[in-house]
Amino acid sequence: QVSDGASVVSVYPGVRVALVAVQRRLGADGGVVMEGRDIGTVVFPDAEIKVFLDASLDERARRRFEELRARGAGADLESVRRAEEERDRRDRTRSHSPLRAASDAVVIDSTGIPADEVAARIVQLVQRRLRA
């Protein structure tokens, strides 16, 4: 619900400006990990490490469907897929901070990869970058 709501209200530039200011205050001292569709391009464009997680539409819909099902929420896979597709369309085409990977982000396609393996890859990336 939070992700969907954020996508809906983020089309309003005034809302985005206010939320970006809050996020920047939270991360002002560094040493934070943040997740979001424009964290690396708008909120923290100078972040030391940026990861852009991606997955196919079908994979993301399946994951969301499983998450909803585990919580006991009634949903069917096709409606979840359509909702994900609409969210992508809305986020990619908004005029203010559209969804895109930062040019210096490491892109990880997590399609078919378990969450713990994706997390391990990110931890390895961070460890390598911090040692460099």
Question: For the regions a protein language model found, what residue spans apply to each?
Answer:
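H-loop (His-switch) and adjacent beta-strand-loop-beta switch element
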Residues: 53-54
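Short glycine-/acidic-enriched loop or helix-start segments at secondary-structure transitions
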Residues: 43-45, 62
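Short glycine-rich anion-binding loops that position phosphate/pyrophosphate groups of nucleotides
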Residues: 38-40, 57-58, 113
